[in-house]
């Protein structure tokens, strides 16, 4: 009787789960994917499991220093991992897999502090509990080794982007519009891949929508579409030194948080809420376009992934900003390359788990600024 799955060509080949909960903190995206040496990854299932508002509140509160942090962090990590386990069980059910068919779960965790300049990054997680709940090997803590090697620990997705999205003869940019925007530059002639965080994206857009719509996000960018970009406010937002800093660089809610936004808005109390939303949309678009113009002026095609790919108003703003910056690039989502935009980040962490299992580096030192490429992650056996 033929085997359901052929013997792998490489000992690390097989089926992996990838889990990613980003800076928007609305839930966890998961994928089940088969990696085989010499072949493109094959997605077997995808799932999204949302977070209760109580968990979101706990995670947001941990973004800034506060009382009783160790206890609050530990309890939030356990609650977070129970949602991760639900996502894994859904992937397993949808793909029709037994536990023994899953090589490992690659899980990012939830970033609550990212301070590489001080030598650390903290992703909230309890991988031991996840291994217990799923009875599958878990690979986690992907960022700390890069930071230990002098890097920013972010972004890590560019190595995966280069593997899946690169094309000889065409300079491409992959732009992730999650809570924070970041870009990966894939040179046409096989030069060094580069990548870095550009600035805020959904983190501030969602925050403003929650305040003024009572909803977790601006559905389809409709709130922003009702407004007009306020040029003086946009200039004030872009005055943040991070935007002018050279790569390698990374950022997060440590900088671009509600307190930062409120401080910038203090001198613009007269600006209508919908105009603020339109201006925050422009901030995301302009900050990305300026970086592309500076570091990838020959880009012919830009592909968007992340939650922002579902915001047509943001995509239109990005197209306009690229045009104004003199970048003649087409703009599409990664779906045009065969990978739905909501899958890309989770796929990257499944791939990092695959790389760990093969004992192959997962970072790119040219991206993160680390002393060299390193094997990333730590194993929690089932």
UniProtKB/Swiss-Prot annotation:
GO terms for molecular function: ATP binding; kinase activity; phosphotransferase activity, alcohol group as acceptor. Its EC number is 2.7.1.170. Pathway: Amino-sugar metabolism; 1,6-anhydro-N-acetylmuramate degradation; Cell wall biogenesis; peptidoglycan recycling. It catalyses: 1,6-anhydro-N-acetyl-beta-muramate + ATP + H2O = N-acetyl-D-muramate 6-phosphate + ADP + H(+). It holds the Pfam family AnmK. SUPFAM superfamilies: Actin-like ATPase domain (SSF53067). GO terms for biological process: 1,6-anhydro-N-acetyl-beta-muramic acid catabolic process; amino sugar metabolic process; peptidoglycan turnover. ATP binds at residues 22-29. Keywords: ATP-binding, Carbohydrate metabolism, Kinase, Nucleotide-binding, Transferase. CDD domains: ASKHA_NBD_ANMK. Transmembrane segments: none annotated. NCBIfam families: PRK09585.1-3 (NF007139), PRK09585.1-4 (NF007140). Belongs to the anhydro-N-acetylmuramic acid kinase family. Catalyzes the specific phosphorylation of 1,6-anhydro-N-acetylmuramic acid (anhMurNAc) with the simultaneous cleavage of the 1,6-anhydro ring, generating MurNAc-6-P. Is required for the utilization of anhMurNAc either imported from the medium or derived from its own cell wall murein, and thus plays a role in cell wall recycling. This is Anhydro-N-acetylmuramic acid kinase. The gene is anmK.
